[in-house]
Amino acid sequence: MDKSLRNKKILISAGASGIGWATAKVCLSKGATVYVCDIESKYLNKVKKHPLNNKKLFIYHCDASNELDVNELFKKILKKTKKLDCLINNVGVAGPTGTIEKLTSKHWEKTLKINVISHFYFTKLAIPMLKKNKGGSIINMSSGAGIMGFPLRSPYAASKWAVIGITKTLAMELGKFKIRVNAICPGTIKGDRMVRVIRDKAKFLKISKKAVENEFVSMTSLNTWVYEKDIGKMCCYLISDESSRISGQVVGVDGNTLRMH
């Protein structure tokens, strides 16, 4: 049995559903201790009832876009451990769908607060714990939209470009502390969020949801969806000692996205 993450301590934001929970499950299966936080009580309650909820899984309610909430979360985690091996900044929202002249400043502010500023809140507090650990890994969730842009999703695309900028800058700043920082760009994930994105885009363009689905799949050279567990596996690699020389990188787990439109 693969226990390559034995004794590793990992914090995952938005960790009770989607990519976050898929990643938590893979990490737990490899022997890690995992701290997950989420704003959604319904997902947290499901996780509490999951068979994997044992002595290596700790569950917290937290609004990642609220700095006071994040501060309180870290106070609770510090009662359990003074060190971290990895922070996974996974929290994010899809943001609005529409051309830029139809968007409001509130659309922008909400998307950036959740997708970018939350990374600052978590990273600032995690760095001392990673330093105490004499090194570790920070993994930031970006997107293909953070490389190519994404028509009708300008706040989302801008936020994911920002995540890559943060990643590369922190990799430079933290390397001397043996802290590696990388970004993952997931592709079109088959999951609840994509259901909402497809619905909104179909409504905006006045086409069928099936047509939008087909369009998303055709954007990749592998003509495939990506699954949440695929991202979890990449996270595990970037946490593990096998990736000890990898930092400042932007890793696509996306079936080779060719375009985004």
Regions found by a protein language model. Give the residues of each.
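Conserved glycine-rich cofactor-binding loop
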Residues: 16-17
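Short, small/polar-rich loop/turn modules that mediate ligand/substrate recognition or access, typified
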Residues: 175, 180, 246-248
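C-terminal helical subdomain
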Residues: 183, 207-242, 246, 253-255
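Short C-terminal tail/terminal secondary-structure segment
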Residues: 4, 94-97, 148, 235-236, ...
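Substrate-binding pocket helix/loop in short-chain dehydrogenase/reductase
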Residues: 98-100, 104-112, 216
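Residue(s) in the substrate-gating loop at a strand-loop-helix junction
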Residues: 143
